[in-house]
């Protein structure tokens, strides 16, 4: 297998459909056109033609599109055949194309990978293709499209350019120490560095928003049996996702629901009631509950308000709180306010949010929705955003750390060499986002997660 091979893959989803598309990219795409179509179509024009088998019989008829390189998606010669979407027809056409020497099936994401390697896309834009396909909400789709069109990359490139100018200034001060003006201490470098830090902080805030749109928030509902966990899952989901009875231990396995709150994906997980297991099935369910809790972004600690007046989680169930991961955020949810007569709404107890509601009637659930959105820093009014992945957040975080360390070197010791090195490392972190400095291993992992025909 060679990266110089001509590749072919189905670009439409498997299964039956009105239209099925095969995409070919590489130097032999021209030969495929001449062999299967009998001619080379006019570049970038839709040509209605028969698709022929090796014996000259017609396999299908449809639209052929010819994009000679470098003016194509991949930067190579690209041919697209748009025929009928029957699996048998597409399979026959694919087999016919693969009889031509030098053709092979594309690896997952190989078309996008070739576009990146041929400078048609940077890495952030290439990732945005997969994110656009996987978008689970309108807001996520719009943000992914912004990333594909270069919004995220432009912000990163602006930061890289600013760091380049700052590095030139710092290194000039190092190389010419005998000048009358002390460039390191005249305040200009500090002012420029502060501007870059402020711009980076703004990009980080927007990237966190973009990461929420892509990844969502994992919320686990946990508590004792019969506290109303499944009722709360149903209330948040807006449908009967879980069976609800008065029998303690009804939920024995993990139940998952995927919803959106004003565009923010929310993965809600209902777990088995936590207690001493009465049988092997319940024991396994409780073990799985703890596994989900340990991986959560937030835990909703469900409390049956009819069983206790306590509001402090450490007082309600100290053993449960002691077992939770140290930095895991907790929201205490006192349920059954319709029975206890408690005032609905949110307050705070010992640093934890406390919400009183009725999962059965739905009263107070909207307060919980808003709390979940706000606790993750999700801003529904942020327009023109972009999607971001965890690797992007890590790169931005590392760049910010290097800039702060560089600032400390500047203000503490006027150490120009150390400042210059921190600026270089920050610049390298940012360049990893767009793929200017990226390992082959990372590229392999990124593109292997794509669809075959992308």
Curated annotation (Swiss-Prot):
The keyword GTP-binding applies. It is found in: Cytoplasm. The keyword Protein biosynthesis does not apply. One of its GO terms (cellular component) is cytosol. Exhibits a very high intrinsic GTPase hydrolysis rate. Involved in the addition of a carboxymethylaminomethyl (cmnm) group at the wobble position (U34) of certain tRNAs, forming tRNA-cmnm(5)s(2)U34. GO terms for molecular function: GTP binding; GTPase activity; metal ion binding. Homodimer. Heterotetramer of two MnmE and two MnmG subunits. K(+) binds at residues 226, 245, 247, 250. This is tRNA modification GTPase MnmE.
